[in-house]
């Protein structure tokens, strides 16, 4: 059985507003407005050939440019010109980017005469012109004879129509291949034909483009068979579409694919996922480049006016969504999800895109926020921060209005979430303060330690986070269990009457995101998947939260040994009941007491057998990751969402939430060197040169220890090393002393060591024997 591929429909919008319970009523109507999110560049290349002519501005003019007076194939015909319906501005046009269901497909009877095309009978399949071997032999002959006629005739015939494309590239031209499991396309032949195409003379390349135009003109009525889908599948892989001179044709190809019905998209998605990694990545990069160059063309005269091709980007985004869905169906994915990011979007007005997405509901106005997989995590962070800033301003403004209306003097403190805590009662004081000031959680955070002088310019806030996280995650505190094999924390399954401290951890993570603080927390990826299940707080309090579908792979991220044992159970070839002697009852230790739990009613009397072992593994995994910690995680979930009650959260993948909270694990020490500031040193000083020679030569584990020693975390903020504001200060002490770090300020105090050997020795000792909390 295949996995179903569904994309949200405009007719079934997602409810995407998140709010604290007291704010929820007022935002109910806003939630319904949001359009659905579809679940998922390089510069222009040179001309087709050295003799390539000027760029073509429109589809019809391109036809005129590439059509010779007479082709050898005299009985072939094509329309003299193409008339498309009037194109509205992109902000008014129904977005092709959204899922287009059967009812949205244009009815031929209801269409205008401009869009109608004659309904052709079922095609008679042409005879397959060549095999892969025949084609390769023709190409080899060209090298010796220089005669391209055979190759030219092949391209002329193959690309002239959809039936010819199927005849050439189907493994069996007469077979139906009406299955998602196999497109029926000979991928090796397609690759050989396209790899050769760019090395052919220009007239052959123009012949191919003319044939594609003819094919698209005939198929404007919409595909009727799987052979039509196969033709689209083949045409989309054409490397000629890397060139801006072909973008008019490429855009119409994308539009026809984008407007296919859901069932056809389902087939294409499963065919896409069976492409090689190389070919799949080429499709993605080509589409990203197309979007980038339409947004910021190097030569605007290359393209039609935006008002006449406003559908280009929505069409490309929809096809990208199909590829993104295909990528998500493969484990591991064909390419990293970050390869779908379009860095060009970092330079557009993302807040306008966000507000369009938020405010215009189902008015069919296109926004890139409907396709968050193309927006980088750095850009999403900007959206979240600006959205949170706007929320903070609105809350502060309301507080100011309330003060004035009561004839009270305004106080600057009303603009901040002011925390006053004692170091000796850090957890309890923090919990009390956050509980009392729930309405202020979205204000800018400022921390004061009772009995201590000091103005919080960011350092005290970071210190509060570091100390609080350090205490809560300590093994003696009992809230979280550290798993050495996986190097991560997980929720303790102990039962208690009050789970408020788990809520505190959730609030801390939310505050960290909104205040741009990177936390040294090690949760497994499945924690962030649960945190977005659902991504908004349900209006019905009876709906479970933090529950998601989990697998043995998720369990392996936390308890690899147990996951390995369950995998062995699933693959065991003997008699499971006799060899394992297990039942649907499991045991857990809580405060030194062993407790038993039935995975299903009467589980202690149900043996695990070869027939029910999959059910056992699924129930056991679900018990460990969902049911046994439900109350703990629910409190954690509500804490996080009480701060991050924003529609912007809908844009994030679980992996991106982790990066926002904990930072990225990818280190670039050269970037850190370029952005480092100095106090008492110059970057040309000998000690500084020694320092960077040593650090850049460190293995990755020591580089991570250095980062943890100086910043409190071995991860990098979303904005990169530059966002650390790393500083090296001169420590006027004996060179026998070790370096000192002030993690609150990302500062390293370095004595003026006289030799590289001495500096390296002292630095390794310092970073290897300290937890990095040089808090003074």
UniProtKB/Swiss-Prot annotation:
Enzyme class: transferase
Residues annotated as catalytic: 744
GO molecular function: ubiquitin protein ligase activity
Domain of life: Eukaryota
Biased composition (Basic and acidic residues): 21-34
GO biological process: protein polyubiquitination
Coiled-coil ranges per UniProt: none
Domain (HECT): residue spans on this chain: 437-776
The keyword Thylakoid is assigned to this record: no
Chemical reaction(s) catalysed: S-ubiquitinyl-[E2 ubiquitin-conjugating enzyme]-L-cysteine + [acceptor protein]-L-lysine = [E2 ubiquitin-conjugating enzyme]-L-cysteine + N(6)-ubiquitinyl-[acceptor protein]-L-lysine
Pathways involved: Protein modification; protein ubiquitination
Region called Disordered, residue ranges: 1-46
Residues carrying Phosphoserine: 9
UniProt cross-references to InterPro entries, sorted A to Z: E3A/B/C-like (IPR044611), HECT_dom (IPR000569), Hect_E3_ubiquitin_ligase (IPR035983)
GTP-binding found in the keyword field: no
EC number: 2.3.2.26
Keywords: Phosphoprotein, Transferase, Ubl conjugation pathway
Annotated Pfam families: HECT
Composition bias, Low complexity: 7-20
Gene3D superfamilies reported for this sequence: Hect, E3 ligase catalytic domain (3.30.2410.10), Hect, E3 ligase catalytic domains (3.90.1750.10)
Known role: E3 ubiquitin-protein ligase which accepts ubiquitin from an E2 ubiquitin-conjugating enzyme in the form of a thioester and then directly transfers the ubiquitin to targeted substrates.
Protein name: Probable E3 ubiquitin-protein ligase HECTD2
């Amino acid at each position: 059985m295949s996995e179903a591929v569904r994309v949200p429909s405009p007719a079934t919008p997602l409810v995407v507003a998140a709010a604290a319970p007291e704010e929820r009523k007022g935002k109910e109507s806003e939630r319904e407005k949001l359009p659905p999110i579809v679940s998922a560049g390089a510069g222009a290349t040179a001309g087709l050939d050295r003799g390539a002519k000027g760029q073509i501005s429109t589809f019809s003019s391109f036809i005129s440019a590439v059509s010779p007076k007479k082709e050898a194939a005299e009985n072939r015909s094509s329309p003299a010109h193409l008339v498309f319906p009037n194109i509205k501005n992109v902000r008014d046009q129904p977005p092709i980017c959204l899922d287009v269901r059967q009812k949205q497909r244009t009815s031929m009877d209801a269409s205008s005469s401009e869009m109608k095309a004659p309904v052709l009978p079922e095609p008679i399949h042409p005879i397959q012109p060549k095999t892969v071997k025949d084609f390769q032999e023709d190409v080899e002959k060209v090298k010796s004879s220089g005669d391209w006629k055979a190759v030219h005739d092949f391209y002329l015939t193959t690309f002239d129509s959809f039936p010819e494309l199927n005849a050439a590239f189907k493994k069996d031209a007469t077979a139906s291949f009406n299955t998602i499991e196999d497109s029926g396309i000979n991928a090796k032949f397609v690759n050989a034909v396209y790899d050769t195409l760019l090395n052919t003379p220009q007239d052959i390349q123009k012949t191919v483009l003319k044939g594609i135009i003819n094919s698209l003109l005939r198929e404007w009525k919409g595909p009727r068979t799987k052979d039509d889908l196969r033709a689209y599948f083949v045409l989309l892989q054409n490397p000629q579409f890397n060139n801006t001179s072909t973008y008019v044709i490429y855009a119409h190809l994308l539009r026809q694919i984008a407007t296919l019905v859901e069932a056809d998209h389902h087939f294409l998605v499963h065919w896409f996922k069976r492409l090689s990694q190389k070919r799949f990545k080429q499709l993605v990069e080509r589409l990203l480049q197309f979007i980038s160059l339409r947004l910021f063309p190097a030569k605007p005269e290359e393209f039609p006016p935006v008002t006449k091709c406003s559908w280009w980007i929505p069409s490309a985004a929809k096809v990208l969504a199909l590829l993104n869905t295909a990528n998500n169906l493969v484990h591991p994915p064909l390419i990293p999800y970050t390869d779908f990011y379009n860095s060009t979007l970092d330079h557009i007005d993302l807040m306008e895109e966000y507000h369009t997405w938020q405010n215009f509901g189902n008015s069919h106005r296109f926004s890139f926020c409907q396709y968050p997989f193309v927006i980088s995590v750095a850009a999403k962070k900007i959206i979240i921060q600006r959205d949170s800033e706007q929320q903070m301003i609105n809350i502060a403004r309301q507080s100011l209005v309330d003060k004035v209306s009561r004839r009270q003097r305004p106080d600057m403190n009303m603009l901040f979430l002011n925390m006053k805590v004692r170091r000796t009662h850090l957890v309890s004081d923090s919990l009390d303060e956050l509980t009392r000031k729930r309405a202020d959680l979205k204000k800018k955070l400022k921390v004061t330690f009772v009995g201590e002088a000091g103005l919080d310019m960011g350092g005290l806030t970071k210190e509060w986070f570091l100390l609080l996280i350090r205490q809560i995650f300590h093994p003696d505190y009992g809230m979280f269990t550290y798993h050495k094999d996986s190097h991560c924390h997980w929720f303790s399954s102990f039962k208690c009457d009050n789970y408020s401290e788990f809520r505190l951890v959730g609030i801390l993570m939310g505050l960290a995101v909104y205040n741009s603080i990177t936390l040294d927390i090690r949760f497994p990826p499945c924690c962030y998947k649960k945190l977005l299940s659902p991504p908004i707080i349900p209006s019905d309090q009876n709906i479970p939260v933090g529950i998601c579908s989990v697998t043995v792979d998720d369990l392996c991220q936390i308890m690899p040994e147990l996951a390995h044992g369950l995998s062995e159970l699933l693959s065991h070839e003997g008699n499971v009941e006799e060899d394992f002697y297990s039942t649907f009852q499991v045991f857990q230790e809580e405060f030194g007491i062993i407790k038993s739990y039935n995975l299903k009613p009467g589980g202690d009397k149900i043996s695990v057998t070869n027939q029910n072992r999959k059910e056992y593994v699924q129930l056991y995994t679900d018990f460990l990751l969902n049911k046994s910690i439900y109350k703990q995680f629910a409190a954690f979930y509500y804490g996080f969402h009480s701060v991050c009650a924003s529609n912007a959260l809908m844009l994030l993948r679980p992996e991106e939430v982790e990066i926002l909270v904990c930072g990225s694990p990818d280190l670039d020490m050269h970037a850190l060197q370029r952005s480092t500031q100095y106090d008492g040193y110059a970057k040309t000083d000998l000690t500084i040169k020694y320092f960077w020679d040593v650090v850049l030569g460190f293995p990755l584990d020591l580089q991570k220890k250095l980062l943890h020693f100086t910043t409190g975390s071995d991860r990098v903020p979303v904005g990169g090393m530059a966002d650390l504001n790393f500083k090296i200060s001169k420590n006027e002490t004996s060179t026998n002393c070790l370096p000192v770090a002030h993690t609150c300020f990302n500062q390293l105090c370095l004595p003026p060591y006289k030799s590289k050997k001495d500096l390296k020795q002292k630095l390794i000792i310092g970073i290897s024997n300290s937890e990095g909390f040089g808090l003074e």
